[in-house]
From Swiss-Prot:
A GO BP annotation: L-tryptophan biosynthetic process
GO molecular function: anthranilate phosphoribosyltransferase activity; magnesium ion binding
Cited InterPro entries: Anthranilate_Pribosyl_Tfrase, Glycosyl_Trfase_fam3, Glycosyl_Trfase_fam3_N_dom, Glycosyl_Trfase_fam3_N_dom_sf, Nuc_phospho_transferase
Name under which the protein is recorded: Anthranilate phosphoribosyltransferase
Cofactor(s) annotated in UniProt: Mg(2+)
Biological source species: Xanthomonas euvesicatoria pv. vesicatoria (strain 85-10)
Sites where the protein binds Mg(2+) 1: S96, E230
Gene that specifies this protein: trpD
SUPFAM superfamilies, sorted: Nucleoside phosphorylase/phosphoribosyltransferase catalytic domain, Nucleoside phosphorylase/phosphoribosyltransferase N-terminal domain
Amino acid sequence: MPITPQEALQRTIEHREIFHDEMVELMRQVMRGEVSDMMVAAILTGLRVKKETIGEIAGAATVMREFSRRVDVADRQHMVDIVGTGGDGSDTFNISTCAMFVAAAGGAKVAKHGNRSVSSKSGSADALEALGAVIELQPEQVASALAHTGIGFMYAPVHHPAMKVVAPVRREMGVRTIFNILGPLTNPAGSPNILMGVFHPDLVGIQARVLHELGAERALVVWGRDGMDELSLGAGTLVGELRDGQVREYEVHPEDFGIAMSASRNLKVADAAQSRAMLLQVLDNVPGPALDIVALNAGAALYVAGVAHSIADGVLRARAVIADGSARARVDAYVAYTRQLAVQA
């Protein structure tokens, strides 16, 4: 017998786990619109207070993937997603979006899953639009862009139409719920490798283990001690690395990669226009902390994608493709190709 919403709520109140298979059935009910908004809000609150388990998160992510519009990719070698949970409140420029262009120029295939801004000044979708790209591409168009440019951006609302069911509840609640940590786990292209930033240190080990449960090959889950959901320049970064079926947790520092420490306030922007300007400065090889943090995160992406032998090797490769202009050229190629796809449609 599948668990009822009332039974699920009772479990969370008693701080007991909803088991993986039960969570799968419960989430299917939610995604089909069979659970009332009041009950959805109550269960989400209960899970948040209790703290979601690996099995609960993996079960919910499985269903979100099931209900998503998939992107079919034939060649997954060196494929990676660079994504964050958001919600770190740092208001920095779009580091992961900038790192996407650098990693693609460095030899990775970047299937990036993202959305508009929720808590920051500029989300990945906002940044790409500011650059002139068309973001609302259909799954087959994303696959085409990935094949031709090494970049495929999957705009979450296009690929997760069932999420409309819970959108009003999430908006009215106005607090983080399990859905904030599900987004980065539900890449519609099924990227086998992922660099994921998280908003809380507890999630470093949890998300790495969830990714293992979901069949990921390699992952780096990161949280900066200054609160950033990226590899940080302002403090050490906690890392949960999934490789060869094992999760290892450790800490890295910018100095490990020959990078000077710098406070995150040096990376702050007020809006998408400022974020675009800082992103293009990095890709024009203007020295400074913005370039350093992009090189660090793109380097980590190249490592987890299997292009680089280590994060340090990845950082060197990232700096090289920024310096020779190929990362900047990748922006122009991607923007032009998405516009071409939109015209053809």
